[in-house]
Amino acid sequence: MKDIIAQFKNRTPKPIYLLHGEEAYYIDRITQAAEDFLLDEHEKDFNLTVVYGKDVNMDQLQEQVKQYPMMAERQVVIVKEAQDIKSWDIMESYFSNPVSTTVLIIAHKHKKADSRTKFFKNVSKHGVVFESKP
């Protein structure tokens, strides 16, 4: 967890973070650190997007992560309650080739993500996977 927060403070993030596991507290801390450190206050209006798994339209999410930031070095897209998303299939091409100016944070709380899925394997290959344990 400290390594991820240090990446955010130093503004050297990876393109994708999968935060998953039983302990929601650490996932919330990392997500808040991303909001606090990756963008300046004046950049957040146009470059910080927070969506919730049960409400997200996956086509729109895919379009959002492929956009370029507005008057900033990067954009940050946070998917909270990602455990409610049934399928990440539409995002597979993005996970294989993420946009370098987007930081996608997937907060998958209260259970582990299935490490056998293509989704998990691609995120592991191109990003950071953090398991939050009690």
Describe the predicted segments one by one:
Residues 1-134:
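Conserved beta/loop motifs at nucleotide-recognition and modification sites
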